[in-house]
UniProtKB/Swiss-Prot annotation:
Belongs to the V-ATPase E subunit family. InterPro entries: ATPase_E_C (IPR038495), ATPase_V1_Esu (IPR002842). This is V-type proton ATPase subunit E. GO terms for cellular component: proton-transporting two-sector ATPase complex, catalytic domain. It comes from Clostridium botulinum (strain 657 / Type Ba4). The keyword Transport applies. GO terms for biological process: proton motive force-driven plasma membrane ATP synthesis. It comes from the Bacteria.
Length: 199
């Protein structure tokens, strides 16, 4: 299994663990948000229904239908907020990796990529101090052993990413930022999280 597959498996496993861990909290939060939105919508619906009865039966049916739609939309919006929180917490968990875990992530990710070996590594300002000369020597030595150029270097450019890194060369980027990795798994994991949170 490649390092990228290991990383992907770890991220999926961590996201699943995080989803389970947050399930109780998320369920309470979801119920609170949904209940508040439903109460507001029901209150508005009752006022609208009362007014509609005075105007006409046909109009009342249309208004009731719109009120139900609004309640449904509010509930969907509340669920989407909870799903977003799960993915945001996954990124935060990755941001809280220890220095060693972060360096291992960078090393294994870069060495699993098919690169030429003369790219620049762009990191967030918060991670600049984590990348040390030892890591760069290790990376370049291992790239050289694979027959690649051993000219990998840290870019002077900073990016507004939450963690991870971006490899850059000649206008081409390989985005391994934490948010990009979590987003790339979102389609795969979203249905599982929906089932875990709302079933």
């Amino acid at each position: 299994m490649s390092n990228l597959e290991n990383l992907t498996s770890k991220i999926i496993e961590d996201a699943n663990k995080e989803a389970e861990k947050l399930l109780s909290e998320a369920k309470k939060e979801e119920n609170k948000i949904v209940d508040e939105k439903i109460k507001k919508a029901n209150k508005a619906k009752e006022q609208i229904i009362e007014r509609a009865k005075r105007e006409s039966r046909t109009k009342a049916e249309r208004v009731i239908s719109n009120a139900h739609l609004k309640v449904r939309n509010n509930k969907l919006e509340a669920k989407q907020e909870m799903i977003n929180k799960v993915f945001d917490k996954a990124v935060i968990k990755l941001q809280n990796l220890s220095k060693d875990e972060y360096l291992n992530f960078v090393k294994s990710s870069i060495l699993s990529l098919d690169i030429e070996g003369d790219e620049e590594i762009i990191v967030s300002p918060n991670d600049k101090d984590k990348i040390d000369i030892s890591l760069m020597l290790t990376l370049n030595n291992q790239l050289k052993a694979k027959g690649k150029k051993a000219l990998l270097k840290i870019s002077n450019e900073n990016r507004n990413i939450k963690g991870g890194f971006i490899l850059y060369k000649n206008g081409i980027e390989i985005n391994n930022s934490f948010e990009a990795l979590v987003d790339s798994l979102r389609d795969e994991l979203e249905q599982e999280i929906i089932e875990a949170l709302f079933s």
